[in-house]
């Protein structure tokens, strides 16, 4: 009979409980592991798994609340561009749930989760020359 002690790892990667989520993700990706023990003052206090990270992503992205996800490509980057976009949305009585700025080789993209389901109103409001409206979609429409 093979026992757990015969096959267990003894040099295990860990993360501190107060570490950033991104740090845990980096360790898990670098080590190709799906579970990471969480430590506090040299004591095991829990684990974080891939599913925990997926859940956190859904929460952070605002997906769980449903609404509209807008993707903009910034065409004229300048100081205050996010403030300009936020003001346009606020003036139209639309609430921003989350904003993610993604700097890619093909440009700067801003993804905004809005607390509305009115895709046509969003399209009508976001018309500045400072950005291109790439996509407007409803989120959390499955299940």
Give the location of each predicted region.
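Bateman/CBS regulatory modules and CBS-like beta-alpha motifs in cytosolic regions of diverse proteins
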Residues: 1-26, 38-39, 44-45, 65-79, ...
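Alpha-helix capping at helix-to-loop junctions
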Residues: 13, 30-34, 59
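Fold-independent oxyanion-binding glycine-rich loops
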Residues: 18, 51, 57
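A broadly conserved amphipathic alpha-helix scaffold signal in soluble, globular proteins
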Residues: 25-29, 87
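Short hydrophobic beta-strand motif reused across regulatory alpha/beta modules
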Residues: 34-39, 45-53
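A conserved regulatory-domain signal marking ACT and ACT-like small-molecule sensing domains
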Residues: 54-143
């Amino acid at each position: 009979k093979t026992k757990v002690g015969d096959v267990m790892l003894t040099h295990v990667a860990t993360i501190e409980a107060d570490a950033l989520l991104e740090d845990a993700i980096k360790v898990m990706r670098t080590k190709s592991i799906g579970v990471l023990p969480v430590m506090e003052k040299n004591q095991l206090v829990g684990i974080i798994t891939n599913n925990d990270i997926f859940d956190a992503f859904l929460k952070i992205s605002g997906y769980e609340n449903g609404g509209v996800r807008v993707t903009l490509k910034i065409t004229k980057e300048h100081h205050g561009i996010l403030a300009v976009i936020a003001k346009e949305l606020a003036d139209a009585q639309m609430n921003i749930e989350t904003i993610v700025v993604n700097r890619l080789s093909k440009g700067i993209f801003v993804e905004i989760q809005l607390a509305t389901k009115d895709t046509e109103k969003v399209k009508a409001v976001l018309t500045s020359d400072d950005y291109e409206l790439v996509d407007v979609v409803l989120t959390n429409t499955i299940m």
